[in-house]
Swiss-Prot record:
Keywords: DNA replication, DNA-binding, DNA-directed DNA polymerase, Early protein, Host nucleus, Nucleotidyltransferase, Transferase, Viral DNA replication
Location of region: Disordered: 14-38, 644-665, 1109-1162
Function field: Replicates viral genomic DNA in the late phase of lytic infection, producing long concatemeric DNA. The replication complex is composed of six viral proteins: the DNA polymerase, processivity factor, primase, primase-associated factor, helicase, and ssDNA-binding protein.
The name this protein goes by in its record: DNA polymerase catalytic subunit
Organism: Human cytomegalovirus (strain Merlin)
Main location: host cell
Compartment(s) where it occurs, according to its Swiss-Prot or TrEMBL record: Host nucleus
Length: 1242
């Protein structure tokens, strides 16, 4: 029992907890003197904390000071308290000379001349009447945290206007019309000479003015207003940080040096060890150094308890946070001791080497007393939830991590904590970051719309678990700390049936967590102190596993390399997708050439929120009805932006310089002559010059020659196809010939691309003007080549890992260029470029196929690449796939032997790869000579840097349809497959296992392979007359075994689990007849834990109308009781399929048509009606729907074997297995004893 004397309030002396007298830390309790009046707060305490085993909560308002107990010592929680655990002191003396520091995060803010910050007159001049301040957070070479305040960077954009003075007056007038809040600013207008990047031959933009405004908040509002009113403006959404990075060549992630500065001792804006002020001209980058200093990291996890016994909801006052675990560790350079940082010799030092906060870096915050959690774990005990949350936030502020991680913390843990603090306890969480709120500090997250959240809560009160948003859509911003949620990282990095922490721990760490059900957590927590220790160990292990995942995957190194390359803050790499990376890189490249990037206005464009604008004084969670660009996420790091879609897309609609994602452009750029002689921009289908709207085909696919190939199939693909096309053909905004171009161009210097609809796009060649995109790509490709060369020579594993992340960042960013030009709602779409890239890719694929057809079968050509031993001896001249072969004993021999006859043919082409079937050559010879063949094709057909590469050779291949195939690769174990059920996450393990066995027979058993080839050459009538080839019987035997396993209760429920992704909030689904939605509703009705948006929902198909285990069935723990659906169920109408899940009863003799049978299909019940949670099925012995599962088996096997089934106009391949499988009657379990007796009587 835990005695809590603080429920009555007003206690100032020692406290008794657990029967022990508590000692007060000197100076911490402030027992003497008058205490300032304390605002009351609500105490919520589980009753079981005070009375072991009791349920319920105790709620009480008190006016006393919040408290914490650490090692039996009472501590008052306040902002000026000294955290009691051991921690490494960072006593920093005044630094003399230049400061070299590594920056990892940046924020922008607007200060006014009367700001209370301690700014010297040297820099305060930049604040008249207001000015931008850019704060660079980082660490010095010795590991001290630092904040560098940079003054003097103005915000500017460009506008076409003939009268400079008049434009200044217009801007002053616009400043009075923009939305509130409006703040004072200084403005200057100067003429500029720049050229729009759109179009070759355009003149410099006439009457171009550079509008410079001291206040970024007002600069953005004024620029957007001018854009809305139709003024031709350029680069209005580029923030001052991006301006500084580009104009001064500063890095957003890497080493910098500040040469002249003022040291801040008093009036600091941040909580960093070092804070200095400098002018924008005093900050310089330190190039060619990709090393890291040591950064503090924090991994945390929370445990909650619902007052109603369901899954906890943050908005409900009874659903409280009961424990928080934290793991403090470091990442980056060498150990702190090696770098000469003192390790706390004042008696507060850490006991473990490299630990900078606590005895071992492991911390547990809990309500009530707690037993022994583990050796050297620092345990903090709190009387109530409010004090627990306040203690954690103070701990967070004291520790001041550079990186914060966890598992699904964006959508749950952080969101839960901030919701409780903001809406229940009215605490401003933003004051706990490295910047106080007044200095532009932010501690908040963007969440999806609250509208459907309310609908969800109304429809399912017990299901409103405060997690309606997907992780990808929730963006977290903490000033001075970068949040890396490992849940979306794992989803982007791996292909797994589910992404639970336990699954990822097994995959990456070879570890399993000791699981504790959320239903058992409340029971253990209220039991006693030892029960709370058990929950604490469970909570702590999650934080430890996430730390290990963080250090194993090393995503932070990869993101840091991209931030440095793309010149954007690290948090934007994590949350804002790929478009902003290309835009900023393009902006940087254009700045060197006096190019500018135009803006255009679209309906619905809103002024983006930025770091410098407070959304509300206490807004820790910002819910917006529509946050443009929320689709950008960590996943975007590992895939290209999608090609152009006809429907509007929210992909990466991010404007440079905004803290959130404002859609930068909607509609299609079309080009025409404008008043400036430059390129006009329009949202209409036709530009000013009358150019027709552009449409084009997407990814190139040659229709495959479906079938099973026992001959080797070589695969060739183009290396970095789309980037190489841009470089090879000089494609760019700046090389596109458009109406209004001033200079005539020699036709020999023009590269033309004609689309399928007859529209032609023309680009000047590199001899006339080098493409900006091409030069940027060339620079990055060369840089990647140099990095990979350094990797080969590097011996240091840490340095090698950093180089590997850098080359990967270069590769991913290069591959994003095509999507940048082709996404209609992107930041700078240019459909002529995207359409031309696609068309050139199609032409390259077609030319490759023709070249292979014309040359690869010619003896004189083959003689240059292959030797005598490379040919297959004994190839029949007449043995081709077109010749029909009868079953065994009926084949006719034809043709003699031709030892060196080779046939090569392209059987499939997919975007950037071609599949070539070779007859007459060994697989080993193709593997050895494949690179030489690819090099020869490249030299004959293409220009640099386009390169055709040899990828692999399939020894045998089943070509099912486009983007779906299975094959056995030469020199590799197992099968390579794409698009089949075996690699889909929705199929259950039982179906996958049967399909895998069938494929193993097909590819490993020679007799089965030959039988499959013979079967593919038979007609349906021949199969009816002669039967299937003998070797194919083995496949049928495996299917019969699978059918018996299902009907005779031999299959575990774990192997029958199906799944679907919850892609959006449940209230947004229009279809109610989806199995996973039905399962979520059943879980909500039982108040069980619900999945998050983005999770996979698992379910099992159960027998209709049955909810108990049938008598006589076996259940040995591993095997699950499975019921058999009676054939009479269909007659009664209980098996009525409305979702296409069932097929008609199999095994009709002689292929009897379905319409002649009166009975309904045996599997005709809707899937959503019989879908159930696997745990519920296992616990209650619910029988499964054997018919449906066997239909799934037949469908899966048919999908992979259909190319070898007999064809013809009257043949239905989906019914073939039903026809050839032997029939068998499965009785209900209740009838089995009678069937045995009848058998004995016979």
């Amino acid at each position: 029992m835990f005695f809590n004397p603080y429920l009555s309030g007003g206690v100032t002396g020692g406290a008794v907890a657990g029967g022990r007298r508590q000692r007060s830390q000197p100076g911490s309790a402030q027992g003497s003197g008058k205490r300032p009046p304390q605002k009351q707060f609500l105490q919520i305490v589980p009753r079981g904390v005070m009375f072991d085993g009791q349920t319920g909560l105790i709620k009480h308002k008190t006016g006393r000071l919040p408290l914490m107990f650490y090692r039996e010592i009472k501590h008052l929680l306040s902002h000026d308290m000294v955290w009691p655990c051991p921690w490494r002191e960072t006593l920093v003396g005044r630094v003399v000379g230049p400061i070299r520091f590594h920056t990892y995060d940046q924020t922008d803010a607007v200060l006014f001349f009367d700001s209370p910050e301690n700014v010297s007159p040297r820099y305060r001049q930049h604040l008249v009447p207001s000015g931008n301040v850019l704060r660079f957070f980082g660490a010095t070479e010795h590991g001290y945290s630092i904040c560098v305040n940079v003054f003097g960077q103005r915000s500017y954009f460009y506008c076409e206007y003939s009268d400079t003075d008049r434009l200044r007056e217009v801007i002053a007038s616009v400043g009075e019309l923009v939305p509130e809040p409006r703040t004072p600013y200084a403005v200057s207008v100067t003429p500029a000479t720049k050229t729009s990047i759109y179009g070759y031959g355009t003149r410099p933009v006439p009457d171009l003015q550079c509008v410079s405004i001291s206040n970024w908040t007002m600069a953005r509002k004024i620029g957007e207003y001018l854009l809305e009113q139709g003024f031709p403006v350029y680069e209005v959404r580029v923030d001052p940080l991006t301006r500084l990075v580009i104009d001064r060549r500063i890095t957003t992630f890497g080493w910098c040096s500040v040469n002249r500065y003022d040291w801040r001792q008093q009036g600091r804006a941040s909580t960093c060890d070092i804070e200095v002020d400098c002018d924008v001209s005093d900050l310089v980058a330190v190039p060619d150094d990709s090393s890291w200093p040591r950064y503090r990291c924090l991994s945390f996890d929370i445990e909650c308890m619902s007052g109603e016994g369901g899954f906890p909801c943050a908005e409900k006052s009874d659903d409280i946070v009961i424990q928080i675990s934290c793991v403090c560790y470091e990442t980056g350079g060498n150990t702190a001791v090696d770098q000469g940082i003192p390790n706390g010799n004042d008696g507060r030092g850490c006991t473990s080497e490299g630990v900078i906060f606590g005895h071992s870096g492991l911390h547990l915050f809990t309500i009530g007393t707690c037993g022994q959690v583990g050796p050297d774990v620092d345990v903090y005990e709190f009387p109530s939830e409010y004090e627990l949350l306040l203690g954690f936030m103070l701990f967070f502020q004291r520790y001041a991590p550079a990186f914060v991680t966890g598992y699904n913390i964006n959508s749950f843990d952080l969101k839960y904590i901030l919701t409780r603090l903001e809406y229940l306890y009215k605490v401003d969480s933003q004051r706990f970051c490295k910047l106080p709120t007044a200095q532009g500090g932010r501690f908040f997250l963007h969440s999806p719309a609250v509208g459907f959240k309310r609908q969800y809560a109304a429809a399912f009160p017990s299901a409103s678990h405060n997690n309606p948003a997907s992780t990808a859509a929730t963006k977290v911003y903490i000033a001075g700390s970068v949040v890396i949620d490992m849940y979306p990282v794992c989803m982007a990095k791996t292909n797994s049936p589910n992404y639970k922490l336990n699954t990822m721990a097994e995959l990456y760490l070879r570890q399993r967590k000791d699981d504790l059900s959320y239903k058992d957590i409340p029971r253990c927590f209220v039991a006693n102190a030892e029960g709370r220790a058990q929950v604490g160990r469970y909570c702590l292990q999650d934080a430890v596993l996430v730390r290990d995942l963080f250090n194993t995957i090393n995503f932070h190194y990869e993101a840091g390399a991209i931030a440095r390359l793309a010149k954007i803050p690290l948090r934007r790499v994590i949350f804002d997708g790929q478009q902003i990376r290309i835009y900023t890189s393009l902006l940087d490249e254009c700045a060197c050439r006096d190019f500018i990037l135009p803006n255009h206005y679209s309906k619905g464009t809103t002024v983006p929120e930025t770091n410098s604008v407070a959304v509300s004084p206490n807004a820790a969670i910002i819910s917006t009805a529509a946050v443009p660009g929320d689709a950008g996420s960590v996943a975007a790091m590992f895939q290209m932006s999608p090609p152009l879609q006809s429907a509007p897309s929210s992909q990466d609609g991010v404007s440079p310089g905004s803290g959130s994602n404002s859609s930068s452009s909607v509609g299609v750029f079309s080009v025409g002559s404008g008043s400036s002689g430059g390129v006009g921009v329009s949202n209409d289908n036709h530009g000013a010059g009358g150019t027709a709207a552009v449409s084009y085909q997407g990814a190139t696919v040659f229709e495959p020659e479906v079938g099973y190939y026992n001959d080797p199939v070589a695969v060739f693909d183009f290396a970095s196809l789309y980037p190489s096309i841009i470089m090879a053909h000089n494609l760019c905004y700046s090389t596109l010939l458009v109406p209004g171009g001033e200079y005539p161009v020699d036709p020999a210097d023009v590269y033309s691309v004609t689309l399928e609809n007859g529209v032609t796009h023309r680009f000047v060649r590199a001899s006339v003007r080098v493409s900006v995109l091409s030069e940027l790509l060339n620079k990055w490709v060369s840089q990647r080549r140099a990095v990979r060369e350094c990797m080969r020579e590097c011996q240091d594993p840490v340095r090698r890992m950093l180089l590997d992340k850098e080359q990967m960042a270069l590769k991913v960013t290069c591959n994003a260029f095509y999507g940048f030009t082709g996404v209609v709602n992107g930041m700078m779409p240019c459909l002529p470029i995207a359409a031309s890239i696609t068309r050139i890719g199609r032409d390259m694929l077609e030319r490759t196929a023709r070249f292979i057809k014309d040359n690869f079968s010619e003896p004189c050509f083959l003689h240059n690449f292959f030797n005598q031993e490379d040919y297959v001896v004994g190839t029949r001249e007449g043995d081709s796939e077109e010749s029909s072969t009868l079953p065994e004993g009926l084949e006719t021999s034809s043709g003699g032997l031709n030892e060196r006859r080779v046939e090569a043919r392209v059987i499939y082409g997919d975007t950037d790869s071609v599949f070539v079937r070779f007859r007459g050559l060994t697989p080993q010879a193709l593997v050895a000579r494949g690179p030489s063949l690819a090099h020869y094709v490249t030299a004959c057909l293409f220009v640099e840097p386009v390169k055709l590469e040899f990828e692999k050779v399939f020894v045998s291949l089943m070509m099912i349809c486009k983007k779906r195939y299975i094959g056995k690769v030469e020199g590799a174990s197992g099968l390579s497959m794409k698009g089949v059920d075996l690699v889909r996450k929705t199929a259950c393990e039982f179906v996958k296992g049967v399909t895998r066995d069938v494929l193993s027979l097909l590819f490993e058993d020679r007799e089965v392979s030959e039988a499959a080839v013979r079967l593919s050459r038979l007609s349906l009538d021949e199969v009816k007359k002669y039967g299937v080839p003998r070797g194919f019987w083995r496949i049928l035997r495996r299917l019969v075994q699978a059918r018996d396993d299902l009907y005779l209760h031999r299959v575990r429920v774990e192997d029958l689990v199906l799944s679907s992704v919850l892609s959006k909030d449940i209230s947004l689904y229009r279809q109610s007849n989806l199995p996973h939605i039905a399962v979520i509703k059943r879980l909500a009705a039982r108040s069980e834990e619900l999945p998050s948006v983005g999770d996979r929902v698992f379910y099992v198909l159960t027998a209709p109308g049955v909810r108990a285990a049938p008598q006589g069935s076996s259940d040995n723990g591993d095997s699950v009781t499975t019921g058999v659906v009676s054939r009479s169920d269909a007659i009664d109408g209980t098996d009525d399929d409305a979702d296409g899940g069932g097929v008609e009863e199999s095994n009709r003799r002689g292929g009897e048509p379905a319409k002649k049978r009166a009975r309904k299909p045996p599997s005709a019940v809707c899937n959503y009606e019989v879908a159930e949670d696997p745990s519920y099925v296992r616990e209650h012995g619910v029988p499964i729907h054997a018919d449906k599962y066997f239909e799934q088996v037949l469908k899966a096997v048919t999908n992979v074997l259909s190319p070898v089934f007999p064809g013809g106009e009257t043949a239905r391949k989906d019914k073939f297995l039903h026809m050839v499988l032997p029939r068998r009657l499965h009785l209900e379990p209740a009838f089995l004893p009678y069937s045995v007796k009848a058998h004995e009587c016979c």
